[in-house]
Amino acid sequence: MDANALLPEILKRSDFIFMGWNVLMLAGLAVILLIGLFPSLRWHTRGGRAVLAGFVFFALTHLLGMIHVVKQWESLSEALKLKIATDPALAEKIDFAIMAPHLGWIVPFHLGFDGFVMLAVWWQSRGWGEHH
């Protein structure tokens, strides 16, 4: 693959990861809002457990998808580095721009947000979030 074709592919992965975070945040906040607005969807109800199970399934598949895209991004970055290795100055300048985020950052943040959503659902289901 030509070096000129690799950079757009890397940028697509970058855009996908950025959009992926937005989708995760919106889905999590939507679940919290649904549970808060509709008492029939609280944890102790069948509907509430279905909503939370749906979020857990979504979050797991979302995380696995993000891991896959980051691995693709890393491979494409390595390929581009090999293609431009003959120009060390360019390789050094472009390194940060094409560097994929480390999975050691993505996984804990993702799981932390997932845990936050589940804790918020549990909290709302206990009635602690209601104003008396």
Locate predicted features.
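Inner-leaflet juxtamembrane helices
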Residues: 16-17, 46-101
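Alpha-helical transmembrane segments
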Residues: 24-31, 54-67, 116-119
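Short linear interaction motif-like sites in intrinsically disordered regions of transcription factors
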Residues: 22, 44, 74, 106, ...
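Cytosol/matrix-facing amphipathic helices and coiled-coil assembly/linker segments
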Residues: 1-38, 87-90
